[in-house]
Amino acid sequence: MRRSLAAAFALCLSAGSACAQEPIKLDVVNDALPKSLTGAPGNPDAGKKVFLTRTLGNCLACHQVTSLKSEDFHGEFGPSLDGVAGRYTEAQLRLIIADPKRIFTDTVMPAFFRNEGLSRVRPEFVGKSILTAAQVEDVVAYLKTLN
């Protein structure tokens, strides 16, 4: 009986927290996110770590970066990110990471900072974004180093 009550209580708590999550609102202006998601600049070193971590950004699974040639598993599906800082503004990079389909409608790149309107999401990730706002800003800061 105690186990049943404990399980029911845990279920109620988890359901309550899932319902309490607010949809992420992005202030898109001209195919860009001009304002930092955190109000502060990102850390390029932390962004590189997110970029390389398979359970976070996992960017090398699809993209190539010459300066990271010592890393394994460079993908060939997405475009090379060499020189990406010269092709896009900081605000454009922020939107491309947060919600790439707003710019590239046919992309298979996931939205790293959305928590609704997604498909094929595992139950434990429903209502959650892949990256936090700070991690998005960190990746943007790292991408800005790729001239």
Residue ranges and their predicted role:
Residues A15-S17:
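N-terminal signal peptide c-region/cleavage motif recognized by signal peptidases
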Residues E22-R54:
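Electrostatic cytochrome c docking/interface patches
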Residues D45-L60, E71-G75, K128-A134:
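Sequence context surrounding c-type heme c attachment/ligation sites in exported
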Residues P34-L37, S80-D82, F125-S129:
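Second-shell loop/turn segments in exported
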